[in-house]
Each structure stands twice: as C-alpha cells, then as structure tokens.
C-alpha cells in the first residue's frame, strides 16, 4: 500500500520543502523530489524508513533520523493536507504558467511598435501595441522562461523526468515582475491629449529611447540580473574578489587533496580553508578570472548535485566559519600546527579543569540553599496554620462557655445572647475554613430561647474580625462574604404516576445536584438536594417540561428544633412553635 496518494503529492512536496529548508543546505525543491521518490518505493513501511535513513544521511546528517520519523508521522496522520485549502489547484497553476510562456513570444515580430516609438505622443484612437500575453499589472510573479528548461550539460535522472538541476537553480524573476514594477504605466498619472483618466503615462521610462532604434525592446530597458547557475552574494561584480565558499562537501571528498585536484583545473589555488564542523571550505585563487571560471562552471562539483558554491565576501563574514580553521595553504607554506588548531576541545579535558569543577560546586551549593529555603518556608507555613487552628478552637470553647454562663445567670440578657450567637456562628464558619471539625460542637443555644436571628449584627468580639483568615478551601479570597443558609433544600413531588416517573428522573439527572430520592408512596417522591441553588433550579424548571406540568411541588422544612423554655423575667413566653417554618404548596420561603 503506498504511503500517500498521488493526488496529494503536490501538498506533500510543499510540506517537505518547508521542512527541508532550515535543516539542509541543498536545494529544498530538488531534495524534496528525491525524498518523495524514496517514499514511492513499493516496499513495507519499515523498509522504506530504513531506505530513507541511508539515502538522506549524506544530505541531512544528524537531522536525518528526526526528519524521517517526523515525515512518517505526518504521512500517518496526513497533517500535510491541512494547508491544502489555501493552495491553488493544479489546473489554475497550469493555466497561469501557460499565460506566461517564453518571453520571446511576448515581443512583437513585426514593426508594429515603430509608430508609437517614433511619435512623441500616441495618436488618438491608437490601441496598446503590447501583446496580449503580457501579464496583468497585478498578476502573479513571472519566471524567466529558461528556469524550467532542461540542462544541456547533464542528462535527466532516470525516474525523475526533467527535474531542475540543483547546480542550476531556478533563474530569478524577470525585472518587470508585476509584483515589483508594473510593465504598464499606472492610470491617472497626468493629463494627456485625451484628458484625465486615460491609461497613458507620457513620461514613462519605456518611452525614453533613441529614435533611431526602431526595434526597441521595452523589456530590455531594465538591467538584467545575473542569470548564472551558481549562487551569488554580489561579490562576483568585484574584480578584486578571488575567494569562493563551497558548502555541503561529502565526507569522502572533504580533504585538501581532492579539493585541490578538482578546482585546480580552473586556476592556481593559493589557499584552502576547511570547516570540519559544517563540511565547507573557502578557496582563494590567484586571480579573479580563475575564481569566476570555477564559480560559473556548469560541471557539478564532485559529481554531486547538492554542493553549493558562493562568492565569499569578507566584509560580511563567513557565518559558518568557526573561530579556528584548519588552514591548508600551498605545499610551500603549509604548517602542521594549523591542523591541530582546528580540533574540537575534548569533553574529557573538562573533567580535569579546575574552573569547571568550581562552577559545578557553586551551582550545587546554590541548589542546596534554594531547597533549604523552600523547606524552611513550608515548615513556617505549617506552624502558622497550626497556631491559627489552635486559636480558633480555643475561641470556640471560650465562646460556648461564655454563652452557657450568660444563659444560666442572666435570663433577661436576650440582646447580649443574640450578639454572642452571631459571633459563635462566625467562629464556626472560620473554623470550618481552617479545616477544624465542628460537628462535635454543641448546637447554638439560639434555638432554646425561642427566637431566630440568623442575621443579627453587633460589635465583633475581641480578637475576631469580620473577614476570615487563611486561604480557605476554594471558597474565594480571604475577604469573601460568608452567610449561613438555613432554607429548605428538600422538595416533595406529588401526583407522580408511573408514566411521569421516568420523565421526572430524566429531568432530575439533567439538573443534577441531588443527594437522595425516596418514595413515601407510589404517587409521592421526596428529593433532597445538596444546596438551595440546585433545588430552586429544579423547582423553577420542572413546570416547563411538558410531561411534568401536572406535578405538585412543595418545600419540606428542615427538622424543627423544639425546646421547652420557661417564661423570662420580662414576661415574654417564647415557644417552639415560633421556630417552625410552615410549608405551603408551591411557595418559596
């Protein structure tokens, strides 16, 4: 089974070019075609993977294994098709290329342009004599026609067709690229004989020509760039430049003898500098003519299509050169000491370096000090939390004793008892935030006095605050308001038939937040919720369900606390009936 479909080959090639560009000095387009040819092998996936490892190692070196593994992952997930919607279709590309056929067909074969160039201004009614093949001013970039022509110096590789020669990369865009300079004058430049808005610019550079040149070619009015097959860094125009930079030299040819034997045919080599790390070198010839012959030669270097050659510009520096090169001069001036200077530092020598050991000891000491500070902070935080818990527990006990004492000695101190009750509730909430168990704390004596004041206010007790200390347990920050909600959280559902029971359970599962469902009878259900919010959500939404509109809902109060109290000295008689919350059907309390 093929690793990819042929209709997806264009997208895969685009992905491979983008992946190869930063990790290889070879031409990304040609190398991607080579990689796709390897992936097309009719073998198992593991065999193709091993083939890619062996064939791409010469070009990618240490990046070979990560690159191949990544490509197979991409092929398995087909992630290279993610950008397919943004790419033009093949038909559109073919159509655009056919529009921009060779430049020679764009130049008129007759003297149809003589009238326009012999007159200072075009006559009224004259049409544009430029051929229809000239691209639109805002059209796509135009490649030089020779960019896709097969090389006449090397035969095409079997199985690859007429692929571009890597030693002869695509020729740059023509100077009249519509994206850079419009071949036609833009409209509305100046007023002509026919008035404003006419598509003529009478001071165009294309009209500045010699009247005697009847065969004036407007496309040659601009200087042509260097269209050679080698890479240039603008140093080839310098007649004093005699240095070349060669990259991506294979290991078997990376020595002074082979390099000199190949490049000596172009002229006398004065100096060869090798860069073992990047397999590149700098060549210095005795004359600019010899260097130019080597640079412009169409012959592949060492018969390898992926070796690149540049003009070396000393002013910009050689970004791949290390600080110390293996400098190999001519045999008359060679020095073996320069060879030793290019050797990399042995990692084993670092173990014998005292400064290296001192640096390791310093880093280790800093790390140990950092761990000590972290442990000390943790211990201090635990001690602080323990003190907070002990203080809160002590305050609770003192508050209970004080409330009990006031209750026994002063029967008429209702206001003071209400204040202590509120403070006691705040202390219980604070203890709950600190993680202290408050279940064993006796109920507040507020229920025994026959009155219910959940929101009683007053001055805070000494040593307490209106906010809660500590981080809490995810209930907001330390300044968040707290309240005790004693409203009912249990609902009684009446008129539940077997048909409505399933719909009721489905809606209950949708709302969630319930704790228990009991069935006192076949037509009645008691539902306990975790909080008042969930209960109200169920209460308000059950009427909107079509099958549950006939149900009757009622709030079930919490267990009433009945406490018999004696009459106060004020003559007030408070009974436990004041604590009961009456339940009315369908009414929120």
Swiss-Prot record:
<dbReference type="GO" id="GO:1990477">
    <property type="term" value="C:MTREC complex"/>
</dbReference>
<feature type="region of interest" description="Disordered">
    <location>
        <begin position="443"/>
        <end position="465"/>
    </location>
</feature>
<feature type="modified residue" description="Phosphothreonine">
    <location>
        <position position="332"/>
    </location>
</feature>
<protein>
    <recommendedName>
        <fullName>Uncharacterized RNA-binding protein C902.04</fullName>
    </recommendedName>
</protein>
<feature type="modified residue" description="Phosphoserine">
    <location>
        <position position="330"/>
    </location>
</feature>
<dbReference type="GO" id="GO:0033620">
    <property type="term" value="C:Mei2 nuclear dot complex"/>
</dbReference>
<dbReference type="InterPro" id="IPR045137">
    <property type="entry name" value="RBM26/27"/>
</dbReference>
<keyword id="KW-0694">RNA-binding</keyword>
<feature type="domain" description="RRM">
    <location>
        <begin position="242"/>
        <end position="314"/>
    </location>
</feature>
<dbReference type="InterPro" id="IPR002483">
    <property type="entry name" value="PWI_dom"/>
</dbReference>
<dbReference type="GO" id="GO:0005634">
    <property type="term" value="C:nucleus"/>
</dbReference>
<keyword id="KW-0597">Phosphoprotein</keyword>
<dbReference type="InterPro" id="IPR012677">
    <property type="entry name" value="Nucleotide-bd_a/b_plait_sf"/>
</dbReference>
<dbReference type="GO" id="GO:0016604">
    <property type="term" value="C:nuclear body"/>
</dbReference>
<dbReference type="GO" id="GO:0000785">
    <property type="term" value="C:chromatin"/>
</dbReference>
<feature type="compositionally biased region" description="Low complexity">
    <location>
        <begin position="330"/>
        <end position="340"/>
    </location>
</feature>
<feature type="compositionally biased region" description="Polar residues">
    <location>
        <begin position="566"/>
        <end position="579"/>
    </location>
</feature>
<dbReference type="GO" id="GO:0071039">
    <property type="term" value="P:nuclear polyadenylation-dependent CUT catabolic process"/>
</dbReference>
<dbReference type="Pfam" id="PF01480">
    <property type="entry name" value="PWI"/>
</dbReference>
<keyword id="KW-0539">Nucleus</keyword>
<feature type="region of interest" description="Disordered">
    <location>
        <begin position="322"/>
        <end position="348"/>
    </location>
</feature>
<dbReference type="InterPro" id="IPR000504">
    <property type="entry name" value="RRM_dom"/>
</dbReference>
<dbReference type="Pfam" id="PF00076">
    <property type="entry name" value="RRM_1"/>
</dbReference>
<feature type="modified residue" description="Phosphoserine">
    <location>
        <position position="334"/>
    </location>
</feature>
<feature type="region of interest" description="Disordered">
    <location>
        <begin position="566"/>
        <end position="589"/>
    </location>
</feature>
<dbReference type="GO" id="GO:0003723">
    <property type="term" value="F:RNA binding"/>
</dbReference>
<dbReference type="InterPro" id="IPR035979">
    <property type="entry name" value="RBD_domain_sf"/>
</dbReference>
């Amino acid at each position: 089974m093929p690793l990819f479909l042929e209709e997806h080959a264009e997208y895969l090639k685009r992905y491979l070019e983008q992946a190869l560009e930063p990790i290889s000095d070879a031409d990304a387009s040609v190398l991607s075609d080579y990689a796709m040819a390897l992936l097309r092998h009719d073998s198992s996936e593991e065999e193709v993977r091993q083939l890619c490892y062996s064939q791409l190692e010469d070009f990618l070196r240490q990046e070979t294994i990560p690159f191949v593994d990544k490509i197979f992952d991409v092929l398995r997930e087909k992630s290279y098709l993610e950008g397919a919607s943004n790419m033009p279709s093949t038909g559109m590309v073919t159509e655009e290329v056919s529009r921009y056929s060779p430049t020679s067909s764009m130049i008129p074969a007759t003297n149809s342009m003589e009238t326009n160039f012999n007159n200072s201004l075009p006559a009224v009614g004259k049409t544009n004599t430029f051929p229809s093949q000239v691209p639109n001013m805002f059209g796509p970039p135009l490649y030089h026609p020779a960019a896709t022509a097969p090389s006449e110096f090397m035969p095409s590789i079997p199985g690859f067709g007429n692929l571009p020669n890597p030693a002869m990369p695509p020729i740059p865009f023509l100077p009249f690229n519509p994206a850079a300079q419009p071949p036609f004058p833009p409209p509305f430049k100046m007023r002509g004989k026919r008035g404003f808005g006419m598509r003529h610019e009478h001071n165009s550079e294309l009209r500045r020509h010699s009247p005697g040149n009847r065969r004036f070619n407007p496309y040659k009015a601009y200087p042509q760039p260097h269209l050679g097959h080698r890479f240039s860094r603008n140093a080839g125009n310098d007649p004093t430049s005699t240095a070349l930079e060669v990259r991506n030299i294979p290991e078997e040819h990376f020595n002074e003898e082979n390099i000199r034997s190949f490049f000596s045919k172009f002229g006398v080599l004065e100096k060869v500098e090798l860069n073992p790390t990047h397999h590149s070198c700098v060549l210095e010839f005795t004359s600019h003519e010899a260097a130019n012959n080597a640079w412009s030669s169409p012959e592949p270097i060492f018969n390898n299509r992926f070796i690149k050659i540049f003009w070396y510009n000393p002013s910009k520096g050689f970004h791949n050169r290390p600080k110390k090169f293996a400098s190999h001069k001519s045999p008359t001036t060679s020095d073996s000491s320069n060879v030793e200077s290019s050797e990399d530092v042995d990692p084993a020598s670092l173990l014998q370096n005292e400064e290296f050991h001192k640096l390791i000891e310093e880093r280790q000491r800093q790390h140990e000090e950092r761990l000590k500070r972290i442990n000390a902070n943790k211990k201090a935080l635990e001690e602080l939390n323990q003190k907070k818990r002990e203080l809160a527990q002590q305050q609770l006990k003192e508050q209970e004793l004080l409330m009990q004492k006031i209750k026994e000695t002063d029967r008429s101190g209702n206001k003071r008892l209400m204040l202590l009750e509120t403070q006691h509730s705040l202390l219980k909430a604070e203890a709950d935030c600190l993680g202290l168990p408050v279940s064993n704390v006796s109920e507040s004596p507020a229920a025994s006095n026959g009155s219910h004041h959940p929101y009683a206010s007053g001055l805070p007790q000494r040593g307490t605050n209106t906010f809660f200390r500590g981080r809490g347990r995810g209930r907001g920050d330390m300044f968040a308001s707290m309240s005790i909600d004693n409203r009912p959280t249990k609902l009684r559902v009446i008129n539940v038939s077997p048909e409505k029971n399933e719909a009721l359970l489905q809606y209950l599962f949708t709302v969630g937040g319930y704790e228990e469902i009991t069935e006192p009878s076949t037509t009645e259900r008691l539902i306990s919720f975790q909080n008042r919010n969930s209960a109200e959500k169920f209460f308000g939404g059950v009427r909107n369900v079509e099958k549950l509109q006939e149900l009757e809902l009622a709030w079930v109060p919490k267990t009433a606390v009945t406490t018999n109290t004696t009459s106060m000295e004020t003559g007030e008689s408070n009974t436990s009936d004041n604590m009961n919350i009456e339940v009315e059907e369908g009414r929120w309390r």
